[in-house]
Amino acid sequence: MINRAQLLDTLASQAPRDFEAQALGLVPIVVETSGRGERSYDIYSRLLKERIVFMVGEVNDQTANLVVAQLLFLESENPDKDISLYINSPGGSVSAGMAIYDTMQFVKPDVSTLCMGLAASMGAFLLASGAKGKRYALPNARVMIHQPLGGARGQASDIEIQAREILYLRDRLNHLLAHHTGQDVERIARDTDRDNFMSSEDAKAYGLIDHVSTKRP
């Protein structure tokens, strides 16, 4: 088995020059030592052991599959212990986001949400969808809500079908957001007509989150 020194030497020798690590998508490695030896994890797998799930970047089918799989896995590990979903996302696909949303409501553990950086569009919707009393944002995080975006091409009848679907999704999202924030649907509709950016404190006052966290409790 490779020892700690060898592993660190290997990682150092493979370190990219000119700050290319992020561009190459390299993930930090954590080494744990136990009575049975040493074991290495990528940082996200190690945090998953602590029931922390990351949703970072665009919300798409791949993101949804990963988040849903982790939520279901953690439920199977312990159905009574909370799961933490950390969000830094500009939003994305409504259908992918709704797959995550439905799974958050479906699993037995409470899913706590925390915004770090930005939770916009579907990211903000999922932030607000966390368990009541367990929705957080860091002090300098930003939250943005708006109506779903869509574009349609083709024949007039096809465009009409797509327009009806967008209107349905807007109405559905507005009702769900009203449920999670305590705002009435009419206000949600007004406030999401255009991009609506909020500070953490504004998001708390609006009902999108419950707490602004400056320190871990």
UniProtKB/Swiss-Prot annotation:
**Similarity field:** Belongs to the peptidase S14 family.
Known PROSITE patterns for this protein?
A: CLP_PROTEASE_HIS, CLP_PROTEASE_SER
Q: What is its EC number?
A: 3.4.21.92
This chain's source organism reads Burkholderia pseudomallei (strain K96243)
Q: What is known about what this protein does?
A: Cleaves peptides in various proteins in a process that requires ATP hydrolysis. Has a chymotrypsin-like activity. Plays a major role in the degradation of misfolded proteins.
Question: Which GO terms of the molecular function aspect are on file?
Answer: ATP-dependent peptidase activity; ATPase binding; serine-type endopeptidase activity
- Where does it mainly reside? cytoplasm
Q: Which NCBIfam families match?
A: clpP (TIGR00493), PRK00277.1 (NF001368), PRK12553.1 (NF009205)
Keyword Plastid listed? The answer is no
Q: Which reaction does it catalyse?
A: Hydrolysis of proteins to small peptides in the presence of ATP and magnesium. alpha-casein is the usual test substrate. In the absence of ATP, only oligopeptides shorter than five residues are hydrolyzed (such as succinyl-Leu-Tyr-|-NHMec, and Leu-Tyr-Leu-|-Tyr-Trp, in which cleavage of the -Tyr-|-Leu- and -Tyr-|-Trp bonds also occurs)
Q: How does it assemble?
A: Fourteen ClpP subunits assemble into 2 heptameric rings which stack back to back to give a disk-like structure with a central cavity, resembling the structure of eukaryotic proteasomes.
| Name of the protein this chain belongs to | ATP-dependent Clp protease proteolytic subunit
One GO cellular-component annotation of the UniProt record comes to:
cytoplasm
Alphabetic keyword roster: Cytoplasm, Hydrolase, Protease, Serine protease
Which residues carry out catalysis?
A: 121 (nucleophile), 146
Question: What Pfam families does UniProt report for this protein, alphabetically?
Answer: CLP_protease
